[in-house]
């Protein structure tokens, strides 16, 4: 993207270390398969949450304003519905989704002690025979970032990505 006023190239995904969490992974899985794992409900159910949690009942519409909804189920059977919105989907390259708004860009109500809004930017690039996966998760304030990190962002997202690799390698 180029700034028309200055002519300089802009990167709209520059992380802010005070607000954002960034996970970078290299894998033997090509970008096409990682993208497929992120956009196919039957595959998401197999890897999206660190076991023994599950993510079920996926509704995904790969268009700006489309739904990115699921239900997280705890080992005890407690259900946590999650409604989100696709902001951008560029096949095999980028998936951006948020829980700050729901399908149709309707403002979301994120209630509860552990609730916070975030926007996730998933970027995929070819790397060797596989891919480089970069997940940038942006938060509105430092407290939300800290809450997400404290609840296990790095362990959870790493475990989930390991599960993605397992599912897509079979």
Predicted feature descriptions by range:
Residues 25, 57-60, 82-88, 117-126:
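Hydrophobic/aromatic beta-strand elements that line small-molecule binding cavities or substrate pockets
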Residues 31-32, 61-63, 87-95, 123-132:
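A short, structured loop/turn motif at beta-sheet edges
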Residues 68-74, 98-100, 109-110:
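Short beta-strand segments that buttress and anchor functional surface loops
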Residues 22-23, 42-81, 92:
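Short beta-edge strand/loop motif at the mouth of beta-sheet-based domains
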Residues 18-24, 31, 67, 81, ...:
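Intrinsic-disorder/low-complexity, polar/charged segments enriched in Ser/Thr/Lys/Arg/Asp/Glu/Gln
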Residues 1-55:
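Hydrophobic ligand-binding cavity/cleft-lining segments
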Residues 34-35, 44, 68, 86, ...:
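Hydrophobic pocket/interface hotspot
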Residues 106-155:
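Beta-strand/loop substructures that line and gate deep hydrophobic ligand-binding cavities in soluble
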């Amino acid at each position: 993207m180029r700034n028309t006023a200055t002519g300089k190239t802009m990167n709209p995904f520059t992380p802010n270390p005070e607000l954002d969490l960034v996970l970078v992974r290299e894998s033997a899985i090509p970008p096409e398969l990682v993208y497929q794992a992120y956009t196919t409900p039957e595959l998401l159910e197999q890897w999206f949450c660190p076991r023994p949690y599950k993510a079920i009942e996926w509704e995904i519409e790969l268009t700006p304003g489309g739904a990115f909804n699921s239900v997280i189920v705890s080992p005890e059977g407690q259900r946590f519905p999650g409604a989100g919105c696709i902001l951008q989907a560029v096949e095999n390259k980028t998936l951006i989704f948020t829980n700050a708004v729901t399908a149709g860009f309707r403002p979301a109500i994120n209630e509860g002690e552990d609730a916070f809004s975030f926007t996730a930017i998933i970027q995929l690039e070819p790397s060797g025979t596989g891919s480089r996966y970069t997940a940038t998760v942006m938060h509105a304030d430092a407290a939300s970032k800290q809450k997400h990190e404290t609840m296990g962002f790095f362990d959870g997202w790493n475990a989930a990505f390991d599960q993605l690799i397992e599912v897509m390698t079979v």
